[in-house]
Amino acid sequence: MSGKHPLVQAIENSQLKTDLPEFAPGDTVVVQVKVKEGDRERLQAFEGVVIAKKNRGLNSAFTVRKISSGVGVERVFQTHSPVVAKIEVKRRGDVRRAKLYYLRDLSGKAARIREKLPARKA
C-alpha cells in the first residue's frame, strides 16, 4: 500500500495511460512526441534504446538514448505524460541489467545489444 491519501490515489489512477506497450531496458523504441510550433502541433519521432526505466505509478519515466550525427543524445520521458503520443517497440533487446548506463561509455559496434529471440515452443 502506498502512503498516499485515497483521493490523491484516485486522481492519479484516472490520469494513468492504459494503451502503453510492454517495453524494458535494452528495447529499441520509437517515441512519438507532440511538439507545438507556433499555433500548430505536430508529432516528432525519437528512436533509440531504452537505457533506464523508473516505475513510480503516475511519476513513471524512462530514458531513451540515441546517437545523432556522432553525438549521444539522451532524453527522459514521463511515461504517462500527454506530450508522449505513442510508444512503439521496434526491437526487443536481451540484456542482464536494469540500468544500461554503461552504454554511455561505449560507441560503435561495442554498444550493440543482442536481440531477444521469441521463446521456443516445447
Swiss-Prot record:
A Pfam family annotated for this UniProt entry: Ribosomal_L19
Domain of life: Bacteria
Organism encoding this protein: Acinetobacter baumannii (strain AB0057)
Alphabetical keyword list: Ribonucleoprotein, Ribosomal protein
CC terms in the record's Gene Ontology section: cytosolic large ribosomal subunit
Record-linked Gene3D superfamilies: 2.30.30.790
Descriptive protein name: Large ribosomal subunit protein bL19
SUPFAM superfamilies according to UniProt: Translation proteins SH3-like domain (SSF50104)
Gene: rplS
